[in-house]
A protein has these predicted regions:
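Phosphate/anion-contacting hairpin/loop surfaces
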Residues: 1-149
Length: 149
């Protein structure tokens, strides 16, 4: 069981991380997120997430506006363990009007995956300390690749 912290002072030397992922939602601490830097990314919304208790900062959640089922079922290979599976996306089902989206229809438990294109990946990597937190995996799209963030 965890403890509920009502003040940042209860953490001692621990500090609020710059990034977090909670239930597949991507959070960025507000002091390092420049909304103007992300304004060119298509298909996202930014929502303020207040931290309960006495914390000096809030987070901004990067929310994908689209949930897309674009799994190429012919070329994808599903195994019992997802790490052994091969995901291939059907490019014809991905609208050009989005730089990132939640992938539907792949996880057997119904979880969505965050999928971003190269433009969004590069925009995110320009954020302060992003290279320390963000990990991307290339996935195949009908012979090309896209990034799984």
């Amino acid at each position: 069981k965890g403890l509920i912290a009502k003040s940042i002072s209860e953490f001692g030397q621990i500090r609020m991380p710059e990034f977090a992922e909670v239930s597949h939602l991507f959070l960025v601490r507000e002091d390092i997120l420049n909304i103007n830097e992300l304004s060119s990314i298509k298909g996202i919304s930014l929502k303020r997430v207040s931290v309960y208790g006495d914390f000096p900062l809030d987070y901004m959640a990067i929310i994908f506006n689209e949930v897309i089922d674009c799994v190429d079922n012919i070329h994808s290979k599903r195994e019992e363990f997802e790490c052994m599976s091969t995901l291939v996306l059907d490019m014809s089902k991905i609208p050009s009007s989005v730089d990132g989206f939640f992938l539907k229809g792949w996880n057997k438990y119904g979880f969505y995956k965050n999928i971003v294109n190269e433009n969004m990946k590069m925009q995110l990597l320009h954020l302060y300390k992003a290279n320390e937190f963000l990990k991307f995996k290339e996935i195949e799209i009908n012979g090309t690749s896209v990034t799984n963030g």
